[in-house]
């Protein structure tokens, strides 16, 4: 039809594999269809988008179940991302009234986190260029998990109890607050 209308043919056409409900193809006749509107009503559009990008690759069949959706949202969005945001805001407000300055009292663990944060956007973008959204999200969530681990390793709540460690505390909080304000974080979260 395009040729008959003298319209150029597409250079690239994206197709997708089957969307499965558990192990079976979704089918109205089987009664195992999960409707996107129902998912959005319950979980919200962003959580559903995240799930679809993470669990349903372009090059393989993707499976969706209510249990899998709840598990992914709880493990990644609530436990990893939500926990990190909550910890960051709570400690920044509690120890520095929400204004954290870099006192530059650095240790090796700080540089490791910074290096990971700087490398992550390039890795995530490369995965997106390969149409591997799930792998791009894995790169982002690896950084978020590492940041949660960084908080556990640096123990800001212990540093806060020692007035002589106040500058180190400020550096630690600054490092994980920086992830949300840097150009690198801005680019990666846009991915």
What spans do the regions from the language model cover?
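Secondary-structure capping and boundary motifs in well-ordered enzyme cores
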Residues: 28, 39-41, 69-80, 105, ...
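Alpha-helical recognition segments enriched in aromatics with Gly/Pro capping
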Residues: 1-67
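Short, charged/polar, low-complexity loop and linker segments
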Residues: 61-66, 119-126
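Short acidic/His/Gly/Ser-rich catalytic and metal-binding motifs that mark active-site loops
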Residues: 22, 59-61, 81, 149-153, ...
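N-terminal low-complexity segments that are often proline-rich with Ser/Thr-Pro
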Residues: 189-191
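Conserved small/polar residues in nucleotide/adenosyl-binding loops
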Residues: 180-187
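Generic alpha-helical structural context detector
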Residues: 41, 49-53, 83-86, 90-93
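Conserved, charged catalytic cores of large soluble enzymes
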Residues: 85-124, 144, 148-165, 169
